[in-house]
């Protein structure tokens, strides 16, 4: 038997009321309190940007409900660390709320009855992972946005640290610190505890193949030669070539405006030695195999040849070959920047 039309209408109204209540309890609007924002770069997507900060795409979307995923707007700030809160709701019947958890979040839930307010929250934090930059140096996480890509040394911010104290500890100027870590602000107002900051960086540009262990650099200027650079920094020419292979074995490709390596963490400054045979101080770097009783030395320049050196010193090419056997029988292995013997 079909129910009376009035009863059908009443049941429909009751059903709609229950559905409305269910929707009201399920579609609770969320509020985001952002603690840290980062600017997206050209080409970033929700997936790639979230992964860069150690977040899932779902968590990123929750922190940025207005983001038009999958694309992001270059230069626009997006929330990376924050709190997601459900708006307050009330109900005359008992209700249960719960929240799911992700690998980088903490959650809480509550069960209430009668007329009450329920809420849930999710707090996200950047994952403590590492990444490898283009310079081969492993970058610890988390780091503040905008940090220089070529950073080679890092410091973990602790309570009580200031930009000035960090710069002093690492013997760097404050302007460099600010340029490497723009997110801290020009007055160090945003130095976030628990984040890594850059305290040393590889300058740019550098020639390809430069040693990854370089700790000291020199900007090649007009008039510079490999010999003049090694003389300035008192390092062996062979080390300079090893650290900067792109310049070539004869310094033919020393590019103006590029930085070259003039020291590594493990290198030591070349020092003069004294020959035991005659007590004459021998400058370095010197030609390997040079005679021990040499009394006069010549620093090989970029335009020098055995013939020109011999002419200047009023000796013969044969003398140079005899006193410096490593130059070869045709005197072709004279190393730029090395000292050779020109008198005994």
From Swiss-Prot:
Residues 1-24 form the signal peptide. SMART domains: LysM. One of its GO terms (molecular function) is chitin binding. It holds the Pfam family LysM. Induction: Highly expressed during the infection and development of decay of apple fruit. Residues 88-141 are annotated as: Disordered. Disruption phenotype: Does not affect radial growth rate and colony morphology, nor lesion development on apples. Residues 36-80, 153-199, 216-262, 296-342 form the LysM domain. SUPFAM superfamilies: LysM domain. InterPro entries: LysM1-like, LysM_dom, LysM_dom_sf. Belongs to the secreted LysM effector family. In plants, chitin acts as a microbe-associated molecular pattern (MAMP) that is recognized by lysin motif (LysM)-containing plant cell surface-localized pattern recognition receptors (PRRs) that activate a plethora of downstream immune responses. This is Secreted LysM effector LysM2. It comes from Penicillium expansum.
């Amino acid at each position: 038997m079909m129910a009376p039309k009035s009863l059908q209408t009443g049941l429909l109204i009751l059903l709609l009321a229950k559905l409305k209540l269910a929707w009201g309890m399920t579609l609770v609007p969320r509020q985001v309190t952002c603690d840290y924002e980062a600017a997206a770069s050209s080409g970033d997507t929700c997936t790639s940007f979230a992964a860069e900060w150690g977040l899932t795409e779902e968590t990123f979307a929750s922190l940025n409900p207005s983001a038009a995923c999958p694309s992001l707007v270059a230069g626009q700030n997006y929330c990376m660390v924050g709190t997601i809160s459900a708006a307050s709701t009330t109900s005359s019947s008992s209700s249960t709320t719960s929240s799911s958890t992700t690998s980088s979040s903490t959650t809480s839930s509550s069960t209430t009855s009668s007329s009450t307010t329920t809420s849930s929250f999710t707090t996200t934090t950047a994952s403590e992972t590492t990444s490898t930059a283009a310079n081969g140096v492993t970058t610890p996480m988390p780091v503040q946005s905008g940090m220089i890509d070529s950073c080679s040394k890092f410091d973990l911010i602790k309570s009580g640290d200031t930009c000035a104290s960090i710069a002093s500890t690492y013997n760097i100027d404050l302007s460099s610190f600010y340029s490497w870590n723009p997110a801290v602000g020009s007055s160090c107002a945003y130095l976030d505890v628990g984040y890594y900051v850059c305290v040393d960086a590889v300058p740019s540009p550098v020639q390809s193949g430069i040693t990854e262990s370089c700790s000291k650099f020199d900007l090649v200027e007009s008039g510079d030669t490999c010999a003049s650079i090694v003389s300035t920094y008192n390092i062996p020419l062979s080390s300079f070539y090893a650290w900067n292979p792109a310049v070539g074995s004869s310094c033919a490709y020393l590019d103006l405006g590029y930085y070259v390596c003039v020291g590594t963490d493990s290198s030591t400054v070349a020092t003069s030695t004294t020959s035991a045979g005659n007590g004459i101080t021998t400058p370095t770097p010197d030609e390997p195999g040079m005679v021990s009783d040499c009394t006069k030395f010549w620093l090989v320049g970029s335009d020098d040849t055995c013939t020109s050196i011999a002419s200047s010193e009023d000796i013969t090419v044969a003398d140079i070959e005899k006193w410096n056997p490593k130059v070869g029988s045709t005197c072709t292995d004279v190393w730029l920047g090395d000292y050779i013997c020109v008198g005994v």
